[in-house]
């Protein structure tokens, strides 16, 4: 059985891993998941990520905690396979009045809402992280 929404699965694994105080979570790897992991690491929401395995690559995310509490307070999928959400550069949302980030898939790659605004790009809103 194939997975319907791999990005939602990735976000759920992160949410569940932090709820269970796991050190790391693993999942099947893809280019889009690696790009999202890169953005999460750059923004300080995860400690690190690495890809393991040759035939079936696995993506391992090392989760981040501060004083025993998960750094990611909320992480939610926005655009999904049944309802895609696209926004122009002027319509990009601010998550929690700028305290969180929106992960946006643009023509220049996956980036935060701030980076997309600076580059003058719109795109598909993949998820919100706060």
Swiss-Prot record:
Keywords: Ribonucleoprotein, Ribosomal protein, RNA-binding, rRNA-binding. GO terms for molecular function: rRNA binding; structural constituent of ribosome. GO terms for biological process: translation. One of the primary rRNA binding proteins, it binds directly to 16S rRNA central domain where it helps coordinate assembly of the platform of the 30S subunit. GO terms for cellular component: ribonucleoprotein complex; ribosome. InterPro entries: Ribosomal_uS8, Ribosomal_uS8_CS, Ribosomal_uS8_sf. HAMAP family: Ribosomal_uS8_B. Part of the 30S ribosomal subunit. Contacts proteins S5 and S12. Gene3D superfamilies: 3.30.1370.30, 3.30.1490.10. Belongs to the universal ribosomal protein uS8 family. The lineage of its organism: Bacteria, Pseudomonadati, Pseudomonadota, Gammaproteobacteria, Enterobacterales. This is Small ribosomal subunit protein uS8.
């Amino acid at each position: 059985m194939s997975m319907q929404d791999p990005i939602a699965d990735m976000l759920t694994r992160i949410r569940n891993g932090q709820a269970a105080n796991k050190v790391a979570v693993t999942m099947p790897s893809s280019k889009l998941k690696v790009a999202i992991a890169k953005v999460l690491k750059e923004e300080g929401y995860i400690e690190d990520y690495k890809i393991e395995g040759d035939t079936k690559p696995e993506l391992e995310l090392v989760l981040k905690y501060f004083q025993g509490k998960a750094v990611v307070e909320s992480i939610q999928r926005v655009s999904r396979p049944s309802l895609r959400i696209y926004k122009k550069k002027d319509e990009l949302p601010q998550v929690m009045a700028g305290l969180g980030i929106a992960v946006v898939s643009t023509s220049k790659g996956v980036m935060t809402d701030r980076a997309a605004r600076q580059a003058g790009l719109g795109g598909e809103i993949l998820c919100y992280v706060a």
